[in-house]
Amino acid sequence: MPLLEARAVSKRFGGLTALNAVDFTLDEGHIASIIGPNGAGKTTFFNVFTGIYVPEEGTVTFRGSPVLGRRPDEITSLGICRTFQNIRLFPRMTAIENVLVGMHSRIPLSFWDVISRNDRWRGQERRQWDHGAELLEVAGLRDKGNELARNLPYGEQRRLELARALASDPALLLLDEPTAGMTQGEARSLMALLRRLVEERKLTLLLIEHNMRVVMEVSDRVTVLDYGEKIAEGRPADVQRDPRVIEAYLGRRRWTPGASAAAGERHA
């Protein structure tokens, strides 16, 4: 059984069809990427998976359970978490406080525990802070816990978002352009971290990514959307050679793993 499965998902906004009968499956322990020119429907697909949008047609299941109709917080509790294209940290909170926010769906405390601050609450608070420090270390931010999020360099803010997402203990992590704004060196370092998380923490990852070099190097499978339709899917090397993908991105020009995101943007 696939970890995540979408069948014939369609989403419309007035007269615009953002997704047109799209099928998608993702197996546990894999890294998959969804690519396509701007406006192809990639983020809309993520928003369907996470309960922000409800499609007009189709089904989505996670571990065999229906996802559609659930609130975003309920979907997070199922084990699906995401990051966004634009950084959404709390800038006036410290790094570790941002991570602690991500644990809210996993805190086994009653209302009385919280307002009375009893022994159960104090023990849970200690465990949360210890786990938050551990996640910062995993993300390469071991000594940054007490720094305000707004004072961190851009690449470290991206890593902090990842640590906060991990705080919800997800089985599936959806990352919307995780390397946006990063140098190639920062992007390679982040991808190495993601690979390690998949291997060590048994995570499953689904990426939206414009950096084709990253997509080709890290993905087990690639799905290509164009104008809301799936035009290709398969191993990275096979997708790279698909004439429909080359046409969608670069017209008749040759597409290489180093092709820039700007080339895709010209098609949008």
Feature-to-residue mapping (PLM):
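Glycine-rich phosphate-binding loops of nucleotide-dependent enzymes
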Residues: 1-268
